Regions:
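Short cysteine clusters
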Residues: 27, 31-34, 270, 276, ...
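Flexible mid-to-C-terminal extensions adjoining Fe-S/redox cofactors in radical SAM and related proteins
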Residues: 295-415, 432-433
Length: 433
């Protein structure tokens, strides 16, 4: 027991990852949709700096808890560069000190990119850090919500940081939040990231801000939030571009997740796993929470300095948190044709009701269903390719042949004929649109 927390056998702990927040919620930007900035209120009068003894204890226990030959440290915020380079030099020293012979230690570092310069990039390159840089598209889309403390756009500052990263050949990916503004311009976003930035690895994260209101519309979302249907169309439009020309050269996280599911494997991303609880968050003072999206008092597992991290991760409280993702699904989800890949999505977004009136439906359900059903044929084809030891990129010539066949099929279809896609709708109300 740790302060009344029931634990299981620490030797049987499943693999887990912890998002470290050494500066807490402190950030040099004031992005309008950031859900984490308000977490500063949890720690009044705090210095918001992870002390050396907390860092060292975490590094040792986290490495000890890893059964495999590789361990990944995930740095987030707030903005982690505000800790300064020397802090991360110390972290690397601790990692070297406590890692086992033959163990590979890697660091994933999420940043807004504003403070990146020669010194940072030299450090990142020499220590093989993988950067995640936040960029929401070209300037008019990025600056819609990603602003500094004075309310000014940050696009130019981020682009300067990306230029440093590319010149030093630091490995990086782009994290793009999808909101009410850029969701209307999917190809503009994708082609900017692909062609202008030259990004090879891209993540799309939907912005969903639940409003605290009462009454029948208690699940309302902010004006900044992406509409569910728009999110589905955003993903599907980009997917159609990607599957026709970029498979094997551009890697989009949700497309990789989908292909894993279609191939009979686990999705590999907590949002789409059947259960969760393996991706936790640790604040600057050692407080460990069930999830980065549940940094709230009810989901505080305990403090690292009061016990062992494995005991906290293995607690019955955390296991129940993870199982609830599966066990609380409404019947509507249990019967859904895309449950195998969606699994109800992230619990933080399950605040609307099903058509039958049951609670617990994900706000993004309509978008997920639109996207996952829309990619079914080509995903089936790629899964078959992989099963037969062929590269997924072989889907691209197949797509081109399918397009030519489709053009031939619809060229003789009148607007009032039934659509050749088999929907049962008239062509003018279906694929002609």
């Amino acid at each position: 027991m740790i302060d009344g927390l029931e634990v299981t056998d620490s030797a049987t702990v499943d693999p887990f990852n912890v998002m470290l927040k050494p500066r807490g919620a402190i950030c040099n930007l004031d992005c309008k949709y950031c859900y984490y900035l308000r977490k500063e209120d949890l720690y009044p009068n705090s210095s918001f700096r992870m002390e050396k003894n907390v860092l060292e204890k975490f590094v040792k226990e986290y490495i000890d808890a890893q059964a495999g030959p590789e361990v990944v440290f995930s740095w987030q915020g707030g903005e982690p560069t505000l800790m300064g380079i020397d802090y991360f030099r110390q972290a690397v020293e601790f990692q070297t000190k406590y890692s086992r012979p033959g163990m590979r230690v890697t660091n994933a570092f999420q940043t807004n990119g504003v403070l990146i310069d020669d010194e940072w990039c030299s450090f990142f390159r020499d220590n093989e850090f993988l950067l995640g840089i936040s960029l929401d598209g070209p300037i008019e889309l990025h600056d819609a919500y990603r602003v500094d403390k004075g309310g000014d756009g940050t696009f130019d500052d981020v682009m300067r940081g990306i230029d440093y990263v590319q010149r030093y050949e630091v490995d990086y990916n782009i994290l793009t939040t999808v909101h009410s503004v850029n969701s209307k311009h999917p190809l503009t976003v994708y082609k900017f990231l692909r062609d202008t930035i030259g990004a090879k690895y891209i993540q799309f994260i939907p912005i969903v801000e639940k409003m605290n209101v009462c009454g029948p519309d208690q699940w309302s979302v902010s004006d900044r939030s992406v509409q569910s249907e728009d999110y589905g169309e955003f993903l599907l439009t980009i997917y159609d571009e990607w599957v026709a020309r970029d498979v094997g050269t551009i890697f989009v996280q949700i497309f990789d997740v989908a292909l894993a599911a279609w191939s009979g494997m686990r999705p590999g991303l907590c949002v789409f796993e059947e259960t969760c609880g393996s991706a936790l968050a640790m604040e600057h003072n050692g407080d460990l929470y069930s999830c980065d999206h549940f940094v709230e008092q009810d989901y505080l597992l305990g403090n690292l300095m009061d016990g062992n991290i494995v005991d906290l991760v293995s607690s019955s409280q955390q296991k129940q948190f993870g199982l609830a993702k599966r066990d609380d699904l409404p019947p509507y989800c249990l019967e859904c044709e895309v449950r195998f890949v969606c699994n109800g999505g992230c619990p933080k977004n399950r605040f609307i009701v099903t058509p039958a009136g049951d609670n617990g439906l994900n706000y993004l359900c309509a978008g997920y269903k639109r996207f996952f059903t829309g990619i079914n044929l080509s995903m089936d084809y790629m899964a078959s390719l992989l099963k037969n030891k062929r590269p997924a990129s072989d889907v691209m010539p197949w797509i081109q042949r399918e397009k030519l066949d489709w053009i031939r099929r619809v060229s003789s279809v009148n607007r009032n004929d039934y659509c050749p896609c088999g929907s049962g709708k008239k062509y003018k109300k279906c694929c002609m649109i």
